A protein has these predicted regions:
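Short helix-capping segments at alpha-helix termini
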Residues: 39-44, 130-134, 152-153, 181, ...
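Active-site gating/metal-coordination segments in enzymes
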Residues: 9, 18, 24-107, 113-114, ...
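Conserved, mostly hydrophobic/aromatic
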Residues: 2, 34, 67, 76, ...
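Conserved residues at the C-terminal ends of beta-strands
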Residues: 13, 79, 139, 189
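Flexible loop residues that form catalytic
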Residues: 15-18, 81, 141-142, 161, ...
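Mid-to-C-terminal alpha-helical segments outside catalytic/metal-binding sites
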Residues: 1-9, 182-185, 199-234
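A general structural detector for well-ordered alpha-helical segments in enzyme core domains, enriched
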Residues: 1, 30-37, 63-67, 91-95, ...
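Catalytic pocket-lining loop regions of alpha/beta-barrel enzymes
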Residues: 74-75, 85-187
Length: 234
């Protein structure tokens, strides 16, 4: 599939739920599975470390260090809505401190439905202020709280949210939203195979059709498609 769509390299994101990504149901097993996928298909995947909030913060930090140093993983994924732990909860503070110190990119799920959601954009702002220089990737662009993220030094990926923006705002306004972040902050992402409205087989064609209607130059499209991610992840 990747070859058919001219995708040279993809990012595998865990879900902060080891029951979904291993048969041993442990975060270490998830990390080994991700390592094995990277090794089986060399040069084709980035993969982010998982967290399991059944473990202590210290245990999660140790597992991330092993995932990055021992398994060759490329970042950390935090999905507050799956863990049930608010992004700015003290549980996550040692994880952010490690990422800040080691300059490890952190991808944060943010598709909040309320102003007090565990992944609300305001919690991302609070975290960024507490840990300056943290390399943040906000997945789903903070959904419909995107304006809160505009002042932050963070990257945003358009996974899941791009078709929802078009459905809500139309192409022109969606184009304006993407432009408001600046091309250098935008990351192409699809959340494949998941989507609230589209079946997996229609996902990429839908994304391509939407982006083809926007005013990005060829050079800007390359930055969004892969250059920004390459600079961030190596």
């Amino acid at each position: 599939m990747m070859d058919a769509l001219n995708i040279e390299k993809a990012v595998i994101m865990p879900l902060n739920d080891p029951w979904l990504m291993s048969m041993e149901f442990t975060v270490d097993a998830v990390h080994r599975n991700l390592r094995d996928m990277k090794q089986t298909y060399p040069g084709r995947f980035y993969a982010f470390a998982d967290i399991d909030t059944r473990n202590t913060s210290a245990q999660s930090v140790d597992a991330i260090i092993q995932a990055v140093d021992g398994c060759g993983l490329d970042g950390i994924k935090i999905h507050p809505n799956n863990t049930g732990v608010a992004l700015d909860d003290e549980y996550n503070a040692p994880i952010f401190a490690l990422a800040q110190q080691r300059k490890i990119p952190v991808a944060i799920h943010s598709y909040p439905n309320t102003e007090d959601d565990v992944s609300v954009a305001a919690r991302i702002v609070k975290t960024a202020e507490r840990f300056p220089g943290l390399q943040l990737i906000v997945s789903h662009m903070g959904a419909f709280q995107w304006e809160t993220l505009l002042p932050l030094e963070c990257s945003v990926d358009m996974s899941a949210i791009l078709p929802d923006y078009v459905r809500t705002y139309g192409i022109a306004k969606t184009n304006e939203i993407l432009r408001s972040f600046g091309v250098d902050r935008l990351l192409f992402a699809s959340d494949y195979p998941d989507n609230r409205h589209l079946p997996p087989e229609e996902l990429y064609d839908s994304y391509f059709a939407i982006l083809d209607q926007m005013d990005f130059t060829a050079e800007e499209a390359e930055r969004i498609a892969y250059q920004n991610a390459k600079e961030l992840l190596g």
